[in-house]
Amino acid sequence: TCHAGVVQCKDSFYGQHEPETKPVSYELMNKWEAWKRLGCLASEMESAALFIVASTLHVRCGSVFLVMANQEREKQGLDNPVAHDTDMAIRVAVEAIRKLIKEDAE
């Protein structure tokens, strides 16, 4: 399954795991709930630097992620399979680059 949309990028990825055990638990939990209400699809901590550098260099940038598991499904007691196969994510990224190259050539 593929999704396109907003992803939260932060500097404390592991703050989302057991946030109630952290000194700023109230803040972490409230921020995550706010991101969910805004339609955020996932959380990660690598892409922000790429987008900053791309903006500075005035070049396009994009990101493709493999969502390994869904902590929200887990909290609800739903099936939460863990994915490790990166093949689909790689194919999506390659196809996106092909489309950009084609558009640039037109």
Model feature map: region roles:
Residues 1-106:
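Glycine-rich phosphate- or other oxyanion-binding loops that anchor nucleotides, phosphorylated ligands
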